[in-house]
């Protein structure tokens, strides 16, 4: 076999980046085309090149001298030479650069056009279009980061004194609210930083990826609104705005202080539902948090002389807040705790003690149901399991609070109540708003329990009326209710609570009732004993206080409301319905009390009449 010595191409030292896998690929291609016949290797010439390049040179010399392989090898060599020349040219330019700006300009041009020549018109248009598209894409995907970046630029370029002097951020917020139908010239938006030279009132919060607003003051004389916010964290999303969900997604408010007219606030929230600009910003909020806030609520339009209601919010966390489902979303809160005139209230999920038993009952009910719980009927399965889900029932509890604080006796519904305390406990079941049911099938069931203690009444000049002006009961129908409450309050007074209260007992109404009897309890030791060294009183006392709170009237009612009726905040309509239910339950209690008193009187009269007949009969016989 004749072995022909080929002319081996000289591999220069700058061509070191050539890799062995390219050579192996060429060898595999040659072997496949020649059916495995490979020419023997020829000993390479002596060279000072590295071992890797020598191996590559050895493989190249073994290839046949056909035109296809020669063209491919020459193309590879040309590409490698061009890249090496470009790299050497860039290194020479960087070496000649005098400062950082020139080096940055060279590197930037090399990334964009691989040269140091001036930009052409086509290249400038391409770069500008890519910059605009990237900014739009950034604005859609991460709106909060986009706005935070430009806020950072503004705060870095301009001084804070200049920003406060020109009121840049105040004008920006007023411009966002200028098209709202309830906004007017009386709305004042200001910032009150502690140090105007250093305080950033509007700045990015990089840790929480939100926009931070500090020391915001909002005041409106027509709406009777004056609120101060310590700081607010906002998250915005242009993507949600394009989908019709609103621009603002998450809101965290800390430290609200000020006063607010409740009637005007309700009208303001109701007006938001018909305003397109407001819905563009606040249609659906995914997460709302309010912490450490205290607001003085004015309950009437002319509430300057009347005392305000101190409403405190310790912690409020809403997974979602929608303008058209404001009440239902508030009642579906994860956490809602606070106080009303120092009376604590809390909204929480009801805890089931017999969860396992309830789950078994649900399974048995679903097994006996007419629905076929297969993969084809997943909607029916979700419907039944949701209706039987006990965790969806929330409980609202308000501790005992004076009725004068809630203004029950000043709105005309309970104008015959003078004093007392009320405790409210409500179990609320809400239909899942995300279910496939129609809007007519979504409802809210409220099981209300009102506990009244130490009630004091007075006979009014006018009968109680609803907010619409309709009469609830007449004055004649109100008389037995007032008599029952006064008698009930007198019957439940602690008898002989202390020897110093004898004067109070002599004027009590219980001594004017013929059906009152005193049942003394047995002697007992006090729970706690306080004895001083110079005390002459006895340690053991007679305790005649009742063990239970007998001076309590418990009213219960159940109310069913369609969720479509709760889209607008109509407090008067809800209170009117609750008032009617409470009056019905109170009337039943009074009727039972009258029936019991009548039976007791009949028994006593019959016993007295029979005893008199017996005495007169024995006297006649004698």
UniProtKB/Swiss-Prot annotation:
The chain crosses the membrane at residues 124-144, 602-622. InterPro entries: Mdm31/Mdm32. It is found in: Mitochondrion inner membrane. Keywords: Membrane, Mitochondrion, Mitochondrion inner membrane, Transit peptide, Transmembrane, Transmembrane helix. One of its GO terms (cellular component) is mitochondrial inner membrane. Residues 1-70 form a transit peptide. One of its GO terms (biological process) is mitochondrion inheritance. It is a multi-pass membrane protein. Residues 71-123 are mitochondrial matrix. Residues 145-601 are mitochondrial intermembrane. Involved in the organization of the mitochondrial membranes and the global structure of the mitochondria. Also required for mitochondrial distribution and mobility as well as for the maintenance of mitochondrial DNA nucleoids structures. Interacts with MDM31. Participates in a complex of about 175 kDa. Belongs to the MDM31/MDM32 family. This is Mitochondrial distribution and morphology protein 32. It comes from Saccharomyces cerevisiae (strain YJM789) (Baker's yeast).
């Amino acid at each position: 076999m004749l072995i022909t010595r080929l002319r081996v191409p000289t591999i220069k030292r700058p061509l070191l980046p050539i890799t062995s896998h390219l050579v192996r690929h060429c060898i595999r291609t040659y072997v496949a085309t020649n059916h495995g016949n490979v020419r023997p290797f020829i000993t390479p010439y002596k060279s000072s090149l590295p071992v890797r390049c020598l191996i590559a040179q050895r493989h190249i010399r073994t290839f046949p001298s056909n035109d296809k392989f020669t063209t491919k090898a020459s193309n590879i060599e040309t590409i490698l030479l061009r890249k090496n020349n470009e790299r050497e040219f860039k290194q020479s330019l960087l070496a000649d650069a005098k400062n950082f700006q020139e080096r940055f300009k060279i590197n930037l041009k090399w990334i964009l056009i691989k040269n140091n020549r001036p930009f052409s018109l086509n290249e400038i248009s391409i770069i500008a279009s890519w910059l605009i598209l990237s900014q739009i894409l950034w604005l859609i995907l991460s709106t909060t980061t986009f706005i935070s970046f430009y806020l950072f630029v503004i705060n870095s370029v301009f001084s804070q004194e200049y920003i406060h002097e020109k009121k840049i951020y105040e004008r920006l917020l007023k411009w966002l609210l200028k098209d709202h139908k309830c906004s007017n010239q009386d709305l004042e938006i200001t910032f009150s930083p502690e140090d105007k030279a250093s305080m950033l009132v509007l700045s990015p919060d990089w840790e929480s990826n939100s926009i931070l607003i500090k020391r915001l003051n909002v005041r409106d004389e027509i709406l009777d609104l004056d609120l101060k916010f310590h700081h607010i964290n906002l998250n915005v999303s242009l993507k949600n705005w394009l989908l019709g969900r609103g621009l603002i997604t998450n809101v965290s408010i800390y430290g609200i202080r000020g006063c607010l007219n409740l009637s005007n606030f309700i009208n303001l929230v109701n007006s938001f539902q018909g305003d397109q600009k407001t819905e563009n910003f606040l249609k659906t909020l995914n997460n709302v948090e309010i912490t450490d806030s205290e607001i003085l609520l004015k309950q009437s339009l002319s509430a300057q002389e009347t005392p305000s209601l101190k409403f405190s919010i310790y912690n409020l966390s809403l997974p979602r807040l929608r303008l058209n489902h404001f009440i239902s979303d508030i009642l579906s809160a994860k956490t809602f705790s606070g106080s009303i005139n120092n009376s604590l209230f809390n909204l929480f999920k009801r805890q089931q003690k017999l969860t396992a038993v309830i789950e078994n009952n649900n399974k048995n009910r679903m097994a006996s149901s007419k629905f076929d719980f297969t993969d084809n009927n997943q909607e029916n399965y979700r419907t039944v399991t949701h209706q039987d889900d006990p965790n969806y029932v929330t409980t609202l509890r308000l501790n005992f609070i004076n009725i004068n604080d809630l203004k029950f006796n000043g709105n005309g519904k309970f104008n015959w109540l003078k004093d007392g305390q009320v405790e409210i406990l409500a179990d609320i079941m809400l239909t899942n708003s995300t279910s496939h049911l129609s809007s007519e099938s979504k409802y809210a069931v409220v099981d209300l329990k009102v506990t009244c203690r130490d009630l004091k009444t007075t006979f009014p000049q006018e009968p109680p009326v609803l907010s619409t002006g309709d009469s609830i009961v007449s004055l004649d129908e109100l008389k037995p209710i007032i008599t029952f409450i006064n008698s009930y309050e007198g019957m439940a007074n602690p008898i002989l609570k202390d020897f110093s209260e004898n004067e109070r007992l002599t004027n009590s109404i219980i001594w004017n009732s013929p059906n009152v009897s005193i049942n003394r309890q047995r002697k007992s030791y006090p729970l706690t004993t306080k004895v001083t060294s110079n005390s002459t009183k006895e340690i053991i006392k007679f305790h005649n206080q009742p063990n239970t709170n007998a001076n309590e009237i418990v009213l219960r009612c159940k109310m069913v409301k369609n969720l479509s009726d709760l889209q607008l905040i109509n407090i008067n309509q809800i209170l009117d319905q609750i008032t009617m239910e409470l009056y019905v339950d109170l009337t039943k209690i009074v009727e039972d009390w009258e029936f019991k008193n009548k039976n007791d009187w009949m028994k006593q009269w019959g016993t007295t009449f029979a005893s008199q007949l017996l005495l007169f009969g024995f006297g006649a016989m004698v």
